């Protein structure tokens, strides 16, 4: 951690200032930029401003230019996801619905047949795997025996966020007991890769 000892005249003594340790180091910024570029998760219009903001946080100035140089080739050859959709704001809005336990209505385009479905859902988590962000949610009012291969499975349904064509956060809330809450970390342990 980067810390400095500074004299504080108001307190009449020296204090340990750890303000600098709260910021990312240049090497940490480089690592995060590399991870983002490798993820290929966003269109350039959303990815590049995030990279630029991270790089601008580098100090001193020569480090800023060094990080720019170190990622310049990957940035130039960056391959956007095939879906070509912007969704960063959607991630935030869905995350807010999850946090507030708001019911949502989504229009979703299925991967395997392109069919569109409207679902009323209880969103419980956002995951990332293999180039895509996913929404984990429980479907309200669905006949599990009719629509699910394993009706006894209590796991949420997984939706690729870029395939959600429209969504609306409803004023209605759903109850979730602490013991039944969805845990992204546990899901990650059980499912290595989710394919869209």
Annotate each PLM feature.
Residues 40-43, 112-116, 190-196:
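Short helix-to-loop capping/linker segments positioned immediately adjacent to catalytic or ligand/cofactor-binding
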Residues 9-11, 130, 161, 171:
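Residue-level signal for tight coil/turn positions that link beta-strands
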Residues 24-109:
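Bulky hydrophobic/aromatic content
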Residues 136-196:
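Surface-exposed, charged, gly/pro-rich loop-and-adjacent secondary-structure segments at domain edges
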Residues 15-19, 76-78, 114-118:
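Short, solvent-exposed polar/charged micro-motifs at secondary-structure junctions
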Residues 1-31:
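Short, basic/aromatic recognition patches that contact phosphate-bearing ligands
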Residues 96-145, 155-157:
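Loop-centered beta-sheet repeat module
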